[in-house]
Design a protein with these regions (language model features):
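Short, aromatic- and cysteine-enriched interfacial helices/patches
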Residues: 29-32, 57-59
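Hydrophobic membrane-insertion alpha-helices, especially the h-region
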Residues: 41-55
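Non-catalytic all-alpha helical scaffold/repeat segments
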Residues: 61-312
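N-terminal Sec-pathway targeting helices
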Residues: 31-45
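N-terminal non-cleavable signal-anchor helices
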Residues: 19, 30, 48-51
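C-terminal region of N-terminal signal peptides and the immediate post-cleavage residues
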Residues: 52-64
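N-terminal intrinsically disordered, acidic low-complexity segments at the extreme N-terminus
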Residues: 1-27
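N-terminal cationic amphipathic segment used for targeting or macromolecule association
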Residues: 4, 14, 42-44, 265
Length: 312
């Protein structure tokens, strides 16, 4: 077996997991949806179980339990720690409390960023509620709309599992709320790529949306998810795979630029907003325009993160 084949097999093995109770999606890179099967397989450490029990009894335990999870070394470990807490909160109808606690942890420097964790919480909330409208109404635009994105992503996957994806109308009822509607368009893109694992097919599916802005926001979600799907790899495999997330895609120049910018943005999440580490990923993209777009995406994410630390 050559090194490239071995690396591909390792990437698929590291990424393999059940999403929203459905089989891994086509294309070898599974979706990032719910982890109910994973919870049953992995269980939770005794200290985490105690934290969940006292979560709603002792107010300070909310920040403590979340900060304990945030202190874990990798995104995958953090997510596994947080998921049982998120499910407990969703079942207790305390979505706002979780989101406000996450933003507080960002402001105080305990948590590097809460956007991806809010994505994850959105997945869990939808799984518990089973309704896009109810899940969207339970939360808010905290963590740069991450919660909204996650809810819609999960809703698309759920609809696909029942064979009835019709994204043209999924966000219609949110048109009176500009933030939620914009986040819904973007979340559709995340969800589409989770369903089919194919960037070009997902981009075509976005074309069914009613307006140019809606379509582009959907494509933006596809391109962001295209880089996010490497986040759970160990660093060695992340370095080998993430820089090439856009290689071989027949995108327009503008979309290719955005795709490469997402490599830099997501590298900032992977490296907890270490700009130099993200730049190392960008320098491996393989061409000057791609490298530059990637570095721009990393810089823009740094600015966004700094603002979030000030305002939540």
């Amino acid at each position: 077996m050559d090194d490239e084949t071995a690396d591909t097999n390792e990437i698929q093995r590291k990424s393999a997991r059940v999403t929203h109770g459905q089989p891994d999606r086509p294309g070898g890179v599974p979706g990032r949806g719910g982890r109910k099967t994973l919870w049953c397989t992995l269980g939770a450490a005794a200290v985490l179980e105690v934290a969940i029990i006292v979560w709603w009894i002792v107010p300070s335990s909310k920040s403590s339990a979340l900060s304990d999870c945030a202190g874990l070394a990798t995104h995958a470990e953090q997510r596994r720690c947080l998921d049982p807490i998120f499910e407990n909160a969703a079942r207790s109808e305390n979505a706002q409390t979780v989101l406000h606690t996450l933003t507080k942890l960002v402001r105080t420097g305990v948590l590097d960023d809460c956007h991806l964790f809010a994505h994850e919480f959105g997945h869990v909330e939808f799984e518990v509620q089973g309704s896009l409208a109810i899940a969207m109404g339970a939360g808010d635009a905290s963590c740069l709309n991450g919660y909204y994105h996650g809810v819609v992503e999960a809703a698309v996957y759920h609809a696909a599992s029942e064979g009835k994806v019709d994204i043209a109308d999924m966000c219609r009822d949110l048109r009176g709320d500009d933030l939620a509607y914009d986040a819904c368009d973007h979340g559709l893109g995340h969800g589409l790529l989770n369903v089919n694992g194919d960037v070009m097919q997902s981009r075509e599916d976005c074309a069914s949306l009613p307006g140019n802005y809606d379509r582009q926001r959907c494509v933006d979600g596809v391109l962001m998810e295209n880089s996010m799907r490497y986040l759970d790899l160990d660093d060695g495999h992340y370095r080998k795979s993430a820089p090439h997330a856009c290689a071989g895609l027949s995108l327009s120049p503008a979309d290719l630029d955005s795709c490469n910018a997402e490599i830099g943005e997501i590298a900032m999440f992977h490296y907890k907003h270490n700009l130099n580490a993200a730049f190392e990923i960008c320098q491996a993209v393989g061409n000057s325009s791609g490298d530059a777009a990637c570095e721009r995406g990393a810089r823009e994410e740094l600015v966004t993160s700094q603002r979030a630390h000030q305002s939540g």
